[in-house]
C-alpha cells in the first residue's frame, strides 16, 4: 500500500475535501508545489489555480479550484485555508468567461476611479477557473 498523508481543503464557507492522499499538488507563488507524505514543515501562500489530489485507489486526481489562500504542511497533515474553494466539476464556465470579459474590459478602459489591482485579481481568478475547467475536461475525455 502506498504511503499517504491526511489533507484538508477548507474555504470560509465549507470543508471541500478531507481525506488521505498519496500526493497533493498546489499552485504556489513561485510555481507548483508537490507534497508527499512526511514532507518537511512548510507554510506558504498559494495563488489562484487548481489543486490536484491523488486519492488512494482512484486512477484520476481530484481537482479543486482555489482563489488563493494559505498552505500549511506538516509531516502527517496538509491543510489548505482557501479564500474560495470549488470542486472543479462544480465550476461554471459561462460565469468564468463573463468574469474574464468584465475584468479585461475594466483593464482596457482604465480611469482614475478603477481599482486596477482588483480588476487584475478578478482576471487572474477567472483565468484560473477556466484552466481548472479545461484540466477537468482533459481528465474526463
From Swiss-Prot:
Function field: Produces ATP from ADP in the presence of a proton gradient across the membrane.
Organism: Dechloromonas aromatica (strain RCB)
A molecular function (GO) term: ATP binding
Disulfide bridge positions per record: none
UniProt-listed HAMAP family: ATP_synth_epsil_bac
Binding partners and assembly: F-type ATPases have 2 components, CF(1) - the catalytic core - and CF(0) - the membrane proton channel. CF(1) has five subunits: alpha(3), beta(3), gamma(1), delta(1), epsilon(1). CF(0) has three main subunits: a, b and c.
Localization annotation: Cell inner membrane
Keywords, alphabetical: ATP synthesis, Cell inner membrane, Cell membrane, CF(1), Hydrogen ion transport, Ion transport, Membrane, Transport
Principal location listed in the UniProt entry: membrane
Membrane-related topology note: Peripheral membrane protein
Protein name: ATP synthase epsilon chain
Amino acid at each position: 500500500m502506498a504511503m499517504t498523508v491526511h489533507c484538508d481543503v477548507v474555504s470560509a464557507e465549507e470543508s471541500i475535501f478531507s481525506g488521505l492522499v498519496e500526493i497533493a499538488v498546489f499552485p504556489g507563488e513561485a510555481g507548483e508545489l508537490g507534497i508527499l507524505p512526511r514532507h518537511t514543515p512548510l507554510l506558504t501562500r498559494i495563488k489562484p489555480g487548481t489543486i490536484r489530489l491523488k486519492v488512494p485507489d482512484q486512477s484520476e486526481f481530484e481537482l479543486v479550484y482555489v482563489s488563493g489562500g494559505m498552505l500549511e504542511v506538516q509531516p502527517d497533515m496538509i491543510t489548505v485555508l482557501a479564500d474560495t474553494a470549488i470542486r472543479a466539476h462544480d465550476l461554471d464556465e459561462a460565469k468564468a468567461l463573463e468574469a474574464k470579459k468584465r475584468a479585461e474590459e475594466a483593464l482596457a478602459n482604465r480611469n482614475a476611479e478603477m481599482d486596477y489591482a482588483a480588476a487584475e485579481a478578478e482576471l487572474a481568478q477567472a483565468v484560473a477557473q477556466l484552466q481548472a475547467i479545461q484540466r477537468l475536461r482533459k481528465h474526463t475525455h
